[in-house]
Amino acid sequence: MNKKAMAAAVSMILAGGAHAAQQERPNVIVIIADDMGYSDISPFGGEIPTPNLQAMAEQGMRMSQYYTSPMSAPARSMLLTGNSNQQAGMGGMWWYDSTIGKEGYELRLTDRVTTMAERFKDAGYNTLMAGKWHLGFVPGATPKDRGFNHAFAFMGGGTSHFNDAIPLGTVEAFHTYYTRDGERVSLPDDFYSSEAYARQMNSWIKATPKEQPVFAWLAFTAPHDPLQAPDEWIKRFKGQYEQGYAEVYRQRIARLKALGIIHDDTPLPHLELDKEWEALTPEQQKYTAKVMQVYAAMIANMDAQIGTLMETLKQTGRDKNTLLVFLTDNGANPAQGFYYESTPEFWKQFDNSYDNVGRKGSFVSYGPHWANVSNAPYANYHKTTSAQGGINTDFMISGPGITRHGKIDASTMAVYDVAPTLYEFAGIDPNKSLAKKPVLPMIGVSLSAISPAKYRSRRAELRG
């Protein structure tokens, strides 16, 4: 499809949405997966069963050329604002000597930008947030400060998925805590991240008056490491990955070709692995397969929680007038424990024995081999890199006005285009002044405005 045809097709996507917004304001729900690879879920060629996301894909459409940042916080800042991550204050992930005190690297959302939550709240929406925030914890940068009426937020970048809430490492400890509506909270004994986030979101949606539209931000921390899932979910994938990473990768490539996401004549990339699967000992193979088993369980469980959200929308009569967006913040993460700059003493607290992998008290990451599988068809490029495997991730949209059901569109879309697109669907003026002082205009454009004449180029910094 040439660029002119792409632009025409994408304009058709929004034609119904703009009309619907004039009649009845749609609910808008943004669902985010954390560190998930391009081909992990079934709509993008994955073997992990994700029936609810598959249903969303069949009732809506997929964008195969959606681009984001190679790192979490910068991506989330662009998604929530429609601005660049530097404009939003998230120019990088950490404080470096060269960026301390520099505008654009405050590492928190600044007042130079307006968030979707602020604009939807101004339009009368009940604005709800559950899950990972990672956009600042100081006054003026928290979810409550940035437009959410209610927020159950994990404030940091990553943590245990159970109630022990152990940080990713010593470097993450300062913002490893949860808040509900701005107040720190402890976690119940039965806490598991994906289930808790969805449960809270469902409760708030059910409590919202039927006549009031909802803007919801459901930001899962799955499948970010540490890889952990409830036992019953891990058991579902027993033995599935004992064939090894190279074979699973080849199978994903075949399904990507069958879907038309990559061409039939695309050569299979060479996986530059430290050890081929066959070179591993039987014990190493068994352990490695178990780690991927846990990763798959996390994604399947996340999909089930999305299913509870869809059921809530039906129960509350919102399912026919809700725009659903699903996306991933960045590509799969190849890193292992050392990445989080923790001391040997930190790692002594974990039991990573085979039987305990994936349970509370363990901390495992799946490393570069399985990350290559997750990022198929992109070999050896991943989170932290500004190559395809780090920045070309999943995007799906369904709901009123989305008429190309089941289609996979190859139009180019960027993370900062999401906010203006959703504003157009909801009939919200993105230029209305909400702040006491002027804010920067968005750099993103609505999907309906993308055309060859409006070609834009932006480059991400490494780890930003």
Curated annotation (Swiss-Prot):
Active site: S72 (nucleophile), H134
Post-translational modification, as annotated: The conversion to 3-oxoalanine (also known as C-formylglycine, FGly), of a serine or cysteine residue in prokaryotes and of a cysteine residue in eukaryotes, is critical for catalytic activity.
Cofactor entry: Ca(2+)
Gene coding for it: atsA
Presence of keyword Transferase: no
Protein name: Arylsulfatase
InterPro entries, A to Z: Alkaline_phosphatase_core_sf, Sulfatase, Sulfatase_CS, Sulfatase_N
The protein's role, per its UniProt record: Plays an important role in the mineralization of sulfates.
Cofactor note: Binds 1 Ca(2+) ion per subunit.
UniProt keyword list: Calcium, Hydrolase, Metal-binding, Periplasm, Signal
Reactions catalysed, as given in the entry: an aryl sulfate + H2O = a phenol + sulfate + H(+)
Residue(s) carrying 3-oxoalanine (Ser): S72
Family affiliation: Belongs to the sulfatase family.
Organism: Klebsiella aerogenes (Enterobacter aerogenes)
EC category: hydrolase
Key word Signal present: yes
PROSITE patterns: SULFATASE_1, SULFATASE_2
Domain of life: Bacteria
SUPFAM superfamilies on file: Alkaline phosphatase-like (SSF53649)
One MF term in the entry's GO annotations: metal ion binding
